[in-house]
Every structure is written in C-alpha cells, then in structure tokens.
UniProtKB/Swiss-Prot annotation:
Organism from which the protein derives: Homo sapiens
Matches recorded under Pfam families: APCDDC
Location(s) in or outside the cell: Membrane
InterPro entries named among the record's database cross-references: APCDD1, APCDD1_dom
The organism's place on the tree of life at top rank: Eukaryota
Protein name: Protein APCDD1-like
Primary location: membrane
GO biological process: negative regulation of Wnt signaling pathway
First and last residue of the signal peptide: 1-24
Coiled-coil ranges per UniProt: none
Chain's gene name: APCDD1L
UniProt keyword annotations, A-Z: Glycoprotein, Membrane, Signal, Transmembrane, Transmembrane helix
Length: 501
C-alpha cells in the first residue's frame, strides 16, 4: 500500500511503538501505550520453524483465497512419505468461494533439496507432475476455460481435449496432462505449480479461552507472481497465505472441515464471511511476521483518521523470518480518497492513497553506514545518521538509497471482514511481485496481502513532531537497541531492485 515507496528489497516489520522514559527520568515509571495486540511479535505470536520441513499429511486452506487476476480458490494438498503428492485446487465464480466453477486434480512428486540462500528460513524443492485433471461444475465454467485456451495456438490443441459446451457432463474428469496426454496445458491456462519450489513449515500455539493452547501447524508455499505472463518463469522468493494441517489448525474454523472432506467431484462450498463496510478508522497491526518477494520480512501498523481521511503508518524492516533482527524503521503519512466499490474484484473497495511525509530510523550498523555513505541531498539532508535515531526525509523528497520517493500516489484495493473469533480484519492490496508501485489505475491490485487486525478502535495521534511521538529508539523485544548481524550482501542484492521504483 502506501508502502510501495519502499523497495521490495527491504523488510519492514512493525514492532509496536511505546513511550520511553524521558531524559533524566528516574526509575522505570515510563508511560506505555502497548496493548497486547501491539506487543512485540516474537512475544505475542511465538512460532517455531520445522527444519527440514515435514510435509507428510493433509494440508488445507482455512478460508477463501484471492490470487492475482483475480482468482478465487481453496486448496487441499496431501503429501505422502514416498514423496508423492496429491493437490486439489477448487476455483470459484465468487469472492466468497460459494459458487464452484471448476476443480483441478494435480498428482506428482516433490523432493526437498536444500535451505534457500535467497529466502531465509525456507527450503528449496524440485517437483515433477504426473497427472493433471479438470472437472467443470457448470457449463459456464467449461465455456470460460475453453475460451481462454482458444486464445493461443498451444491452447487450441488443449481445448480439443475438452467437450463442446452442449456435451458437458457434471463430474466428468478431463485429463490436461498424463502419460497419454502429452503437452503442457497448464501453461496454456496460465497455471503452474511453482509454489512447490519454496517450502516452509512452522508450528505455533493458539491461545484458547479457558483451555490449554492449541497446536497449529502451517505450510507456507511459494508466492504467485502478480503478472500472469511471468508465472511460467518465476521462481518464488515469498509466500502465499499458508495452508494449515487438517489435524492441527486454528479453531474455530468453519471452512476447515468442509475443505478437508472435499474432493475434485465435490468442491467445498464455504459459508460467506461476515463482510464489514469499509469504514477506515482505528489502529491496525500485522498479526505475524510477514514475508514479501525479494526477501522482505516485515510487520506493519496503520492508523486511519476517517474524519480527515488521513493515514499514518510504521514499517519495521527485519533481516530474519522471525522478525527479531531489525534493520530500519519507516514512518510514513498522507491522505486518501473516498472509496468506491471495485468493478473488477467483487467485495473490494478502490481508493487512492497519497504519501506526503516520511521519517527513517536506521536500526542496525549496516543500514546506518549505508545512509552515511549516501549523498546528503538524497536522504535527509546534511548531518550524520546514527543508529536508533529518527530523521525526517520529507525535505529531500524521500530517501533514494531506500527507494522512498515523495510525494507518491498509489491506486489501492481494500476490504474488511470479521473472522470466526469476532476480530475485524483489514485486507490491503498485494504488492506487485516485481517491486514496482501501483501508481496508475491499470496497476491497481487484484488480490490482497495478509490481513491486518484491529488493535484499537481509536487511532493514536502520530501526527505530532517526532520528538513528541512515542520513541522507537529502543527495540521492544529486548528493552534496548538490538544490533542485528545483517550481512552486507543481502542489502546490496536488495538495492539492485531500486531501479523499478
């Protein structure tokens, strides 16, 4: 979102602001505004990565997923000790996954290789597809897929494997790939299974009211490129929304049982979520350490002031997948327009955001050194940068070394929902995979990032000058400035992406 001004080479993680003791103040009587949802992520959402990842067993979506396009789907994957896998992908006509269109059955073999040198905490894998079949749940879906295939020469060969619309049979399985059916019809449909080439498994404990915490296992697979034309060649460096173990998933989860019991002939029909009208206001935070393509680890905090249509955000970048090693923090602010219903993504609202102010706080030695080596006129003006000290970069029109450019306009997509626990969720448009910015209406997102959670209904006032805002000079997870060993190579690789901004 408005953070697009930040390079996709950097990682922002919102750790939560708190008020530090004033200079000369005695003792520990510091004023804090830090509710539970704004406590440091490692403290409030502890998780453990399983290395090497153990894939065996069934994994399911926990709700309706939105991929760029948009495509609405749910997934149910099963991995076997023999390295074989069976994947069901259920596609829908609607954004609530209540009107099945067609289902894919994908069978193949996957082999874990080595720890990823690009995405920390992930494992690279190879896969081979043995069979791909498709079942159409309506005549309309058959006509739609056939029309897509007929747009290319290779697709027309694949379209011949499908029946004419008048001969549609409910439940019939048509092979798109097998030992008998040669050729890659997945490519003609714009589909790949490259998500299997990047894997991460982690465990966490979900607190339960009046009961022991519940074990939750999550499977993160590689992200899907936001440009369909690039998906065939793209190798993931980020993740999709995670699947969860069918045996160890969050509770309550109305969709989980439906998806776990489904098959290619009986797709799950999900109950619609409680959609909320988009009334921006309050204080929204990341629910976990987020991962973006090009090795970004971050959390976000946004406040929206509905009466003035202004917004503010803190982005904390980290160098590790647990969001414990901070690299730098960005404060950004601006205004947004009144939203209008999206005609392209049902259930979404289109807005335009303007970024007019930004402040930067280097949080490790490498970032501090990089900023001190940059031209003063390109980031913050004259004066040396020091670790943990915030500086205003508005007067220099941003901070070129970090890819921040001001003023900046973005065309956004928002939606709000309520989860089964009654929490309000805010979905913001997915960032372009190539690191560019949605700075034209044509580049407006058609899918969403991980949701933010409503932390407080009234937005705290971040608009006053930095010296009067809650101090970010101490890392909340340690009580003092955390100096993370952040290697120079990832930073250099990251800065290579800046030519896209």
């Amino acid at each position: 979102m408005p953070a697009a001004m930040l390079p996709y080479a950097c990682v922002l993680v919102l750790l939560g602001a708190h008020t530090a003791p004033a200079a000369g103040e005695a003792g520990g009587s510091c004023l804090r505004w830090e509710p539970h949802c704004q406590q440091p992520l490692p403290d409030r959402v502890p998780s453990t990565a399983i290395l090497p990842p153990r894939l065996n067993g069934p994994w399911i979506s926990t709700g309706c997923e939105v991929r760029p396009g948009p495509e609405f789907l749910t997934r149910a994957y099963t991995f076997y000790p023999s390295r074989l896998f069976r994947a069901h992908q259920f596609y829908y006509e609607d954004p609530f996954c209540g009107e099945p269109a067609h289902s894919l059955l994908v069978k193949g073999k996957v082999r874990l290789r080595r720890a990823s040198w690009v995405t920390r905490g992930a494992t690279e894998a190879d896969y081979h597809l043995h069979k791909v079949g498709i079942v159409f749940h309506s005549r309309r879906a058959l006509v739609d897929v056939t029309g897509r295939l007929n747009q290319t020469r290779a697709g027309r060969d694949c379209a011949r494997r499908l029946p004419p619309a008048r001969a549609w049979l409910p439940g019939a399985l048509y092979e798109l790939r097998s030992a008998r059916a040669q050729g890659d019809c997945l490519e003609a449909l714009g589909l790949t299974m490259h998500e299997l080439s990047l894997v991460r498994v982690q465990r966490r404990l979900q607190p339960q009211p009046r009961a022991s915490p519940r074990l939750v296992e999550e499977l993160y697979l590689g992200d899907i490129h936001t440009d369909p034309a690039e998906r065939r060649h793209y190798r993931p460096t980020g993740y999709q929304r995670p699947l969860q173990s069918a045996l160890h998933h969050v509770q309550p989860c109305p969709a989980c049982g439906l998806i776990a019991r489904s098959d290619v002939h009986h797709p799950p029909v999900l109950p619609p979520p409680l959609a909320l009208p988009l009334h921006l206001g309050g204080w929204w935070v990341s629910s976990g350490c987020e991962v973006r393509p090009a090795v970004l680890f971050l959390t976000r905090l946004f406040t929206f002031h509905g009466h003035s249509r202004s917004w503010e955000g803190y982005y904390h970048h980290f160098s590790d997948p647990a969001c414990r090693q901070p690299t730098f923090t960005v404060y950004a602010a601006g205004r947004y327009t009144r939203g209008t219903p999206s005609t392209r993504v049902r259930g979404g609202t289109e807005l335009v955001f303007e970024v007019t102010r930004a402040h930067v706080t280097p949080m490790d030695q490498v970032t501090t050194a990089m900023l001190n080596f940059s031209e003063p006129s390109s980031c913050g003006g004259a004066g040396a940068w020091s670790m943990g000290t915030e500086r205003d970069v508005t007067a220099t029109n941003g901070c070129l070394p970090l890819g921040i450019r001001l003023p900046h306009v973005e065309y956004e997509l928002f939606k709000m929902e309520q989860d089964p626990l009654g929490q309000s969720l805010l979905f913001i448009g997915q960032r372009p995979t190539d690191g560019s910015s949605p700075d034209t209406p044509e580049k407006r997102p058609t899918s969403y990032q991980a949701p933010l959670v409503l932390c407080h209904g009234e937005a705290p006032d971040f608009s006053r000058p930095p010296q009067h805002r809650p101090s970010l000079q101490k890392h909340p997870s340690t009580g003092g400035l955390h100096i993370a060993p952040f290697p120079l190579l990832p930073l250099v690789l990251g800065l290579a992406f800046l030519h896209w901004l």
